C-alpha cells in the first residue's frame, strides 16, 4: 500500500510521486453525492517525508474504488504530526472546467455529461441513466452544473448518485451506500491495511 505524494506542479500521475508517505492514518469518507471527507495524518518523521505535505499537493492512495488522487486543501502541524484535509481531484474542475452556455437538449445521462465535460478534455463522465431530459447551464463551473442548488443541476434534472473516480465522475441511477475506508499503517495492521465501513 504505497501512498505517493506529488508536488503541486507535478501532474504526471502515471509515474511515482515526488515522495512516498508513511501516514499513521488515512481516511476516505465518501458520502454518495455529498462531500468526500479525506484526512491524512503523518508523523513528523526524521526523513522529512512530512515536508512534502503542502497545500495543493496531490496524494495517490487506495480507496474503496481503487487508486485515487486527492488534492490537499488544508494542513495543520502539531508538535508530533501533520494533519491534512484532501478532496477528490475531480474537484479541480471547479477552477478549470467552465460551462459558458451549454444546453444538453433531449439527452440521456451519458449524452448530457459528455456535453458538460467537453469544455476540458481532462474530465470525463459515465452514466447509466436512460431518462431523456433538457437542461441549461450558463456561466457555471462543472461542479455547480453537476450538483448544486441550481434547478438545472444534473442531479436535479436527471437524478442519480455521484462517485468520483480520479478525472472521471460516475453518475448512475444507484451508486450504492455511503462508503468509508480507513487505511491504517503500522505493525499491527492486516496484510492490506484496509478496514472498510459501509
Which role does the model predict for each range below?
Residues 80-197:
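Charged- and aromatic-enriched interaction segments used to assemble
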Residues 5, 197-198:
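Leucine-centric amphipathic alpha-helical interface motifs
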Residues 12-21, 58-67, 146-156, 190:
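Short, solvent-exposed secondary-structure boundary motifs
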Residues 3-11, 45-78, 103-118, 152:
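Short, acidic/charged, Gly/Pro-enriched secondary-structure junctions
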Residues 27-36, 74-82, 163-167:
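Short, ordered beta-strand-loop transition motifs
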Residues 1-52, 87-93:
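Juxtamembrane "anchor/assembly" segments of surface/extracellular structural proteins
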Residues 3-5, 38-40, 59, 72, ...:
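Hydrophobic beta-strand residues in large extracellular and virion-surface proteins
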Residues 23, 72-74, 189, 195:
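A structural signal for short, hydrophobic beta-strand segments that form beta-sheets
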Amino acid at each position: 500500500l504505497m501512498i505517493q505524494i506529488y508536488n503541486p506542479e507535478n501532474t504526471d500521475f502515471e509515474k511515482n510521486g515526488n515522495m512516498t508517505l508513511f501516514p499513521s492514518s488515512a481516511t476516505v469518507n465518501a458520502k454518495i453525492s455529498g462531500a468526500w471527507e479525506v484526512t491524512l495524518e503523518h508523523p513528523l518523521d526524521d526523513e522529512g517525508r512530512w515536508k512534502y505535505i503542502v497545500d495543493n499537493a496531490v496524494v495517490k492512495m487506495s480507496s474503496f474504488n481503487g487508486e485515487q488522487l486527492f488534492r490537499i486543501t488544508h494542513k495543520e502541524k502539531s508538535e508530533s504530526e501533520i494533519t491534512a484535509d484532501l478532496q477528490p481531484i475531480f474537484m479541480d474542475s471547479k477552477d478549470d472546467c467552465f460551462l459558458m452556455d451549454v444546453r444538453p437538449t433531449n439527452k440521456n445521462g451519458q449524452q448530457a455529461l459528455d456535453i458538460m465535460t467537453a469544455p476540458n478534455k481532462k474530465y470525463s463522465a459515465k452514466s447509466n441513466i436512460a431518462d431523456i431530459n433538457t437542461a441549461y447551464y450558463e456561466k457555471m463551473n462543472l461542479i455547480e452544473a453537476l450538483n448544486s442548488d441550481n434547478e438545472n443541476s444534473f442531479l436535479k434534472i436527471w437524478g442519480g448518485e455521484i462517485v468520483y473516480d480520479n478525472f472521471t465522475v460516475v453518475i448512475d441511477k444507484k451508486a450504492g451506500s455511503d462508503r468509508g475506508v480507513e487505511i491504517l499503517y503500522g505493525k499491527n495492521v492486516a496484510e492490506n491495511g484496509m478496514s472498510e465501513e459501509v
